[in-house]
């Protein structure tokens, strides 16, 4: 919705492709097509008939390859299709990082056919518990599990493969440390850093995100280091245009490990709201400008704090705060999205949120 609303605000004719069920943009776009976002040939045909001027997505990993494919075929501004596919596969991503020395956790990929093979069993000797398993091609904490003992290994990996589109699971070294994410916007291979976010998650086994706060409390020196690593990671993947969102762990002894990077802005309101609230830069408009080939170098006009708290069973003390968010001038938006509060295993299990902006971090 933020992308569609911004495009309409800019006076653009908006064509949207999505599954019809739950398509919240259906009634406000100029043209809606009930087509799966992975149907790249069908989408390309329509885009060619319309003769579009640009194509983009802001928070969908699944849509990113289709966006790149259409842009490439129509000579529009976008990422290379192969790069977009690479950024959508955690194994290919890690392989690209290792080739150029981008620091990341130890990893391997398994499939149902290889999981119990002698080669995989032998390779696992290089890992120690705890470890992490996750689908190779999903986001939003879906299918992510921390494995702390051998008896959990096969059920957790099989769970990750079930959640994967391609039935592939990553097995990773578990890195203990603080979590951050990084927002960039790129145009023609030049990468512009926008913000770093501190992240708070649930404990093991699923690590679902509960809070995001900008800017991070990292030192200026660490900001520079993280930005430099992210630029190298973007170059390694071949991502040259549009938004990107990188996730990191930083250990107590200062080790930095990039977990993954996506060719889209951060979800959970990070890209669509928090960057603008903390820096003054309209990230969503920037993504549209890139797609149209009219990009302007970002200018930060604010130096504020902004953040979001999510409501779920683990944070049920927030319920009254979210319900009455408009009574507090520090809050800019809030909503109860589900009256049932569930213990979360993925981001979709959360039941509401509240967003703040202020001169300092707001603790609730």
Describe the function of each predicted region.
Residues 99, 121, 286-364:
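Peripheral (often C-terminal) accessory segments that flank ATP-dependent C-N-forming ligase machineries
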Residues 254-256:
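Conserved protein kinase catalytic/activation segment
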């Amino acid at each position: 919705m933020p992308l569609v609303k911004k495009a309409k605000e800019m006076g653009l004719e908006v064509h949207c492709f999505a599954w019809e069920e739950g398509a919240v943009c259906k009634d406000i776009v100029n043209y809606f097509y009930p087509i799966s976002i992975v149907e790249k040939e069908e989408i390309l045909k329509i885009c060619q008939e319309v003769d579009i001027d640009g194509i983009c997505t802001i928070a969908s990993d699944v849509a990113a390859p289709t966006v790149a494919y259409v842009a490439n075929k129509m000579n529009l501004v976008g990422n290379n299709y192969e790069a977009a596919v690479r950024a959508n596969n955690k194994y290919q991503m890690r392989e690209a990082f290792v080739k150029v020395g981008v620091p990341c956790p130890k990893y391997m990929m398994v499939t149902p056919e290889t999981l119990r093979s002698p080669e995989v069993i032998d390779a696992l000797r290089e890992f120690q518990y705890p470890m992490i398993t996750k689908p190779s091609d999903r986001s939003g904490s879906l299918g992510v599990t921390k494995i702390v003992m051998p008896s959990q290994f096969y059920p957790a990996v099989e769970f990750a493969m079930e959640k994967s589109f391609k039935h592939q699971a990553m097995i990773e070294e578990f890195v203990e440390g603080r979590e951050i994410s990084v927002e960039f916007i790129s145009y023609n291979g030049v990468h512009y850093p926008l913000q770093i976010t501190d992240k708070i998650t649930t404990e093991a086994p699923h690590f679902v995100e509960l809070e995001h706060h900008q800017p991070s409390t990292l030192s200026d020196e660490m900001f520079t280091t993280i930005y430099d690593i992210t630029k190298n990671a973007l170059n390694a993947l071949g991502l040259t245009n549009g938004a990107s969102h990188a996730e990191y762990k930083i250990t107590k002894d200062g080790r930095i490990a990039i977990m993954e990077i996506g060719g889209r802005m951060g979800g959970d309101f990070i890209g669509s709201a928090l960057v603008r609230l903390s820096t003054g830069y309209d990230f969503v408009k920037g993504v549209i400008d890139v797609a149209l080939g009219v990009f302007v170098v970002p200018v930060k006009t604010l130096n504020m704090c902004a953040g979001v708290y999510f409501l779920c069973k683990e944070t049920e003390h927030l319920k009254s705060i979210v319900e009455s968010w408009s009574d507090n001038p520090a809050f800019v938006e809030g909503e109860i999205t589900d009256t049932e509060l569930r213990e979360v295993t993925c981001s979709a299990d959360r039941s509401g949120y509240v967003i703040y902006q202020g001169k300092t971090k707001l603790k609730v």
